[in-house]
């Protein structure tokens, strides 16, 4: 399920858009012998996003700046599909999203006959390893992630690495209509 709320004009003379979104999804493994979903094996995602956007008057009136804080929680329970490097555990994703948009398409917003639209955006997570001082380059040699033979336990290593997701994404998109 998901629940979304958007307030396009949050008071004042200048329009400030406020948005809120909450979602949850749960996927179960399929048991080919019983031809039913196996409820003991699942992958669950819960998410929450709060954002604000406003029009800018500099350099012209076609610019818009939007920002959002997003959190996602991933839980895997006996979900060994090869899609992830671990099948049991959880992961957290906290990110800050910012985008700058210039949109001056005209005539029809679905099928524009003129104008242009350009977007540059970034999605950033906090640098957890820098904050906590964790260095995962030598995690395979650490005693807490090895078995009694001294061999690395890959599922525990991956769970430690991906407990808090750390990344950045930069995107640019442009369209020109004539």
Predicted features and spans:
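Gram-negative/organellar outer-membrane beta-barrel architecture
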Residues: 1-111, 117
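Extended beta-strand-rich architecture
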Residues: 95-178
């Amino acid at each position: 399920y998901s629940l979304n709320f958007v307030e396009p004009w949050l008071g004042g003379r200048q329009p400030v858009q406020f948005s809120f979104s909450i979602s949850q999804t749960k996927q179960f493994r399929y048991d080919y012998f019983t031809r039913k979903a196996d409820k003991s094996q699942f992958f669950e995602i819960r998410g929450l996003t709060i954002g604000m956007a406003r029009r800018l008057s500099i350099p012209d009136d076609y610019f818009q700046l939007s920002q959002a804080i997003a959190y996602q929680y991933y839980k895997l329970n006996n979900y060994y599909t090869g899609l992830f490097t671990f099948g049991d555990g959880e992961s957290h994703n906290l990110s800050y999203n910012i985008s700058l948009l210039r949109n001056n398409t005209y005539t029809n917003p679905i099928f524009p006959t003129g104008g242009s639209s350009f977007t540059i955006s970034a999605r950033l997570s906090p640098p957890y390893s820098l904050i906590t001082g964790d260095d995962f380059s030598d995690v395979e040699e650490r005693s807490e992630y090895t078995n009694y033979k001294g061999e690395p336990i890959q599922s525990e290593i991956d769970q430690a690495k991906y407990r808090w997701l750390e990344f950045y994404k930069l995107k640019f998109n442009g369209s020109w209509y004539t």
